[in-house]
Amino acid sequence: MVATCLQVVGFVTSFVGWIGIIVTTSTNDWVVTCGYTIPTCRKLDELGSKGLWADCVMATGLYHCKPLVDILILPGYVQACRALMIAASVLGLPAILLLLTVLPCIRMGHEPGVAKYRRAQLAGVMLVLVALCAMVATIWFPVCAHRETTIVSFGYSLYAGWIGAVLCLVGGCVIVCCAGDAQAFGENRFYYSSGSSSPTHAKSAHV
């Protein structure tokens, strides 16, 4: 029973974390920047936000983004963080699907428990890799961006990435280390026996 609960907890935690990583990858509010001194920016109410795909300017009644489409002039850290976040988002999909197939409520024929166990271990390792890719990108990006401009604060995209990476790491570790062995995966099956058929009563007809 404990192993079953841990499997479900690992799946839910990993799924929520993967969604957070996708949100981080697709949005541009990674860091809030200031082109002048911080007091000047606050006085002018003019701040910027920087992400993987665009640089945005936020002013009173104005929000304008400039897409970062010229790969040749992009800083190396932006391209590397893009690759890491895309890899994390793509790798998370098969990991989540593998975890879905090893849940106790899912049964694929009469497969042995060791098959589910191996899929669970593979999915857990993949989720740990997803978490590591996201962690490296979400830590590396603000450090390098701070060298180019003044960072006022971190954006919601970065927080979503940190939370998502931690959740994927926790979920992957739970699946790999705590969700039971091959025997536990074999025992977590639910069988439903159909009720006994009602006896048929034959009626004899007298002519």
UniProtKB/Swiss-Prot annotation:
GO-annotated biological processes: bicellular tight junction assembly; cell adhesion
Bilayer topology annotation: Multi-pass membrane protein
Pfam families in the cross-refs: PMP22_Claudin
Membrane-side (Cytoplasmic) residue stretches: 1, 104-122, 179-207
GO cellular component: bicellular tight junction; plasma membrane
Keyword line: Cell junction, Cell membrane, Membrane, Phosphoprotein, Tight junction, Transmembrane, Transmembrane helix
Function as written in the Swiss-Prot or TrEMBL entry: Plays a major role in tight junction-specific obliteration of the intercellular space, through calcium-independent cell-adhesion activity.
Subunit structure: Interacts with tetraspanin-3/TSPAN3. Interacts with OCLN.
Name the UniProt record assigns to this protein: Claudin-11
Upper classification of the organism: Eukaryota, Metazoa, Chordata, Craniata, Vertebrata
